[in-house]
C-alpha cells in the first residue's frame, strides 16, 4: 500500500513500507520519498501497480534526484536509468549498498539546480538536508524523525554541542514545511522549533 499526499502546489510525497525493514529496528517501516517540482529526494520506487505515483512522474518528469544520506540509496539507480535524472549525494556509502550510478557530490554550502541549498545538520552522519526555496521546504533523511507523530531530533552523543547549534542556524531560512523520511512525514516551522527543545529520539549509538 502506497500513500500519496499533496503538501503544497508542486510539493508532494509518496509513502510505503521499506523492503529492508526488520522487526526490532529503531525506525518505522513506512518511509517517505519527496517530490518538489522536478526534484526527487531519497526516492524509493513503488510497485508498478501503484499507478498514481508513476502517472504523476510521467506528467512532471523528474530532472534531478538527491540522496540525502549514505544509507538512503534506495532506488536512485532506477530513477537515473528510467528518467535520466542528474543524481546528487554523498561520495561514501555503506558496504553492500553502493549505487552503480556515480553521483555528483553534494556537500553543505552547495547550490544544486533549481536553487536547492545543501545544508549541514551537525550530526556527523554524512547527511545533507536540502532547502527547497521555491516551496519553502526543508527535506531531511534522518536528522529529524516522528515515530509517534511528534517531531524529534534523532539522538547523537553530541546533541547539545553540535547538533542543536547547526539546526538552529537553519531558522535563518524562511521555510514553512519540514519533511522527514521516517514516521509522520510533514511538519511545520513551529514543529521544528519545538523539536529543538524536546529530548532527542533513540539511542546515541544508532547509525541513523
Regions found by a protein language model. Give the residues of each.
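Metallo-beta-lactamase
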Residues: 3-5, 16-19, 39-47, 119-205
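Generic beta-strand structural signal
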Residues: 32, 63-64, 85, 114-116, ...
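Active-site HxH/HxHxD metal-binding segment of metal-dependent hydrolases
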Residues: 45, 49-112
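Active-site-flanking structural segment that lines cofactor/substrate pockets
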Residues: 24-56
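Zn-dependent metallo-beta-lactamase
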Residues: 1-37, 208
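Flexible, charged surface loops at secondary-structure boundaries
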Residues: 6-7, 28, 34-37, 57-61, ...
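A contiguous pocket-lining binding segment that forms or flanks enzyme active sites
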Residues: 98-132
